[in-house]
């Protein structure tokens, strides 16, 4: 999760997030190059004497037309690749349904006969020592690591948004509509997110906690939860 005074992204825990971080660095390099060029030209114009001679500058016009087009292509190609990757859902090992409510989340594991629960934020007064304020929940979403997970997202009342930054996931939850996304958790851990669509007075109290575990631990957890 994010640390205090952190300026960069959270550590990537999925292939999609790794691609997003690389694209951010790529776009930042392009932006810095453009800013450096503009600042150099401004400094050059300020220090050099200007000539009032009007000349035909077809070469300059050609350069400032073609160069921005090349820059846009360099930004568009990796962006389109990531967009297609985010929309691709290829034979998921597990399907999870997330339903947004005011102000909690409900989860259903559709591959299991009877595995569903509600996930509420733990109030600050009940929070154990060492846990994170406004981010901990009473029931975490547990998924097997290194497995394709499909998440079907909807809402039961107003607009919500299911977002876990370290997994590179953010999908709107819309009443009467099913949206879907997917991710692969590449390492074990606990990943925190929050509702990312203003949904009412307690919008800030809708945390999301995804716990990635090895497959044997997930199977044990699902068996115990189904039995209870």
Swiss-Prot record:
Any single GO CC term annotated in Swiss-Prot or TrEMBL for this entry: respiratory chain complex IV
InterPro entries assigned: CcO_II, CcO_II-like_C, CcO_II_C, Copper_CuA, Cupredoxin, Cyt_c_oxidase_su2, Cyt_c_oxidase_su2_TM_dom, Cyt_c_oxidase_su2_TM_sf
Chief place of localization: mitochondrion
Residues at which Cu cation A1 binds: 160, 195, 199, 206
Cofactor binding: number and manner: Binds a dinuclear copper A center per subunit.
Binding site for Mg(2+): 197
Membrane topology annotation: Multi-pass membrane protein
PROSITE patterns assigned to the protein according to its UniProt record, in alphabetical order: COX2 (PS00078), COX2_CUA (PS50857), COX2_TM (PS50999)
Enzyme class: translocase
Transmembrane region(s): 15-45, 59-86
Catalysis: reaction(s): 4 Fe(II)-[cytochrome c] + O2 + 8 H(+)(in) = 4 Fe(III)-[cytochrome c] + 2 H2O + 4 H(+)(out)
Names of the cofactor(s): Cu cation
Residues binding Cu cation A2, per UniProt: 195, 197, 199, 203
Family matches, as PANTHER family: CYTOCHROME C OXIDASE SUBUNIT 2 (PTHR22888:SF9), CYTOCHROME C OXIDASE, SUBUNIT II (PTHR22888)
Purpose of the protein: Component of the cytochrome c oxidase, the last enzyme in the mitochondrial electron transport chain which drives oxidative phosphorylation. The respiratory chain contains 3 multisubunit complexes succinate dehydrogenase (complex II, CII), ubiquinol-cytochrome c oxidoreductase (cytochrome b-c1 complex, complex III, CIII) and cytochrome c oxidase (complex IV, CIV), that cooperate to transfer electrons derived from NADH and succinate to molecular oxygen, creating an electrochemical gradient over the inner membrane that drives transmembrane transport and the ATP synthase.
Similarity comment text for this entry: Belongs to the cytochrome c oxidase subunit 2 family.
The protein's name: Cytochrome c oxidase subunit 2
Source lineage: Eukaryota, Metazoa, Chordata, Craniata, Vertebrata
């Amino acid at each position: 999760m994010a640390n205090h005074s952190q300026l960069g992204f959270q550590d990537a825990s999925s292939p999609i997030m790794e691609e997003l971080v690389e694209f951010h660095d790529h776009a930042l390099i392009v932006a810095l190059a453009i800013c450096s060029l503009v600042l150099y030209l401004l400094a050059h114009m300020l220090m050099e004497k200007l000539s009032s001679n009007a000349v035909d500058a077809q070469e300059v016009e050609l350069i400032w037309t073609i160069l921005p087009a090349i820059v846009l292509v360099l930004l568009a190609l990796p962006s389109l690749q990531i967009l297609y990757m985010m929309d691709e859902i290829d034979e998921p090992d597990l399907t999870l349904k997330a339903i947004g409510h005011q102000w909690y989340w409900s989860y259903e594991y559709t591959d299991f006969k009877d595995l569903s629960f509600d996930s509420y934020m733990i109030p600050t007064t009940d929070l154990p020592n060492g846990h994170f304020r406004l981010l901990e929940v009473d029931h975490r979403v547990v998924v097997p690591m290194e497995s394709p997970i499909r998440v079907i997202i909807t809402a039961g009342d107003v607009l919500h948004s299911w977002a876990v930054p370290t997994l590179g996931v953010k999908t709107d939850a819309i009443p009467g509509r099913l949206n879907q996304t997917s991710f692969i958790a590449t390492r074990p851990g606990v990943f925190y997110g929050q509702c990312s669509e203003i949904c009412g007075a307690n919008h800030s109290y809708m945390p999301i906690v995804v716990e990635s575990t090895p497959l044997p631990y997930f199977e044990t957890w699902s068996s115990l939860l189904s039995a209870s």
